[in-house]
Amino acid sequence: MVSPIIDVKHLDYRYPQQATDQLTLHDISFTVMPGEWVAIVGHNGSGKSTLAKNLNGLLAPAAGTITVDGQVLSEETVWDIRRKIGMVFQNPDNQFVGATVADDVAFSLENQGVPRSEMLTRVQAALEQVNMQDFATREPARLSGGQKQRVALAGMIAARPQILILDEATSMLDPRGRQEVLTTIRDMKANSALTVLSITHDIDEAASANRVLVINDGEVKEEGTPAEIFQHGEALIKMGLDMPYAERLKAALKRQGVQVPAQYLTEKGMADWLWQLRSNK
């Protein structure tokens, strides 16, 4: 039987300035299986980014356990676990350290002591995978937001983590940049057994995941497939979230007497279905 690659049990967290009876995270429990894409959604201040920082040891929980690939997260294991996790943050400008795109992608490999010949091969392959090979000698500051996040993802590809955590990685991007990043992640998953955990308030992004956790007031309120979660439209709105564009479009079509198959959860899926519907007329 396959074991979870992430296993969180009864996790509590409070910030130092909080009173002892106040918790930012309360009794959080969930698992993530190898190769799964799980989206953790919630409004700003719900606790989802605090959870992400607990998962890779940037913050230490007040109670509960986090197990990653069979290792319980602790002061003794944190560096081993961090080697298994790649993290892409909200602001791409905060994660660049190299003078050029290629230098930045190579940074984590230098820290790992990867031989130079292998490093060059992995950097080139990673940039090709995110379609940024023509920008290898560019300064990161001169890239667009979507390009910067694709370079950050290239750094993760080159480092070959088992788990990729995206902490609001698309929230500062325009729609085109957001789509570039999500397409890159789908391609990464198609080419490897990568496990993805995306922390987001963008309910449309969650439609790409295999499973969705909804966090509100520091607690897991809902868990299920995107289709199951999107059925709880009113509950999501009460928690400060919106319904995905595809679901709003479905509702509008149903009001016009057009029945839409339930499996179309994304804008692209709906566009393809509408085009097929039009072509059949």
Curated annotation (Swiss-Prot):
Keywords: ATP-binding, Cell membrane, Membrane, Nucleotide-binding, Translocase, Transport. Residues 6-242 form the ABC transporter domain. InterPro entries: AAA+_ATPase (IPR003593), ABC_transporter-like_ATP-bd (IPR003439), ABC_transporter-like_CS (IPR017871), ABC_transpr_CbiO/EcfA_su (IPR015856), ECF_ABC_transporter_ATP-bd (IPR050095), EcfA_1 (IPR030947), P-loop_NTPase (IPR027417). SUPFAM superfamilies: P-loop containing nucleoside triphosphate hydrolases. CDD domains: ABC_cobalt_CbiO_domain1. ATP binds at residues 42-49. It is found in: Cell membrane. It is a peripheral membrane protein. It is an enzyme of class 7 (translocase). Disulfide bonds: none annotated. It holds the Pfam family ABC_tran. Its EC number is 7.-.-.-. GO terms for molecular function: ATP binding; ATP hydrolysis activity; ATPase-coupled transmembrane transporter activity. Its main location: membrane. One of its GO terms (cellular component) is ATP-binding cassette (ABC) transporter complex. Belongs to the ABC transporter superfamily. Energy-coupling factor EcfA family. ATP-binding (A) component of a common energy-coupling factor (ECF) ABC-transporter complex. Unlike classic ABC transporters this ECF transporter provides the energy necessary to transport a number of different substrates. Forms a stable energy-coupling factor (ECF) transporter complex composed of 2 membrane-embedded substrate-binding proteins (S component), 2 ATP-binding proteins (A component) and 2 transmembrane proteins (T component). This is Energy-coupling factor transporter ATP-binding protein EcfA1. The gene is ecfA1.
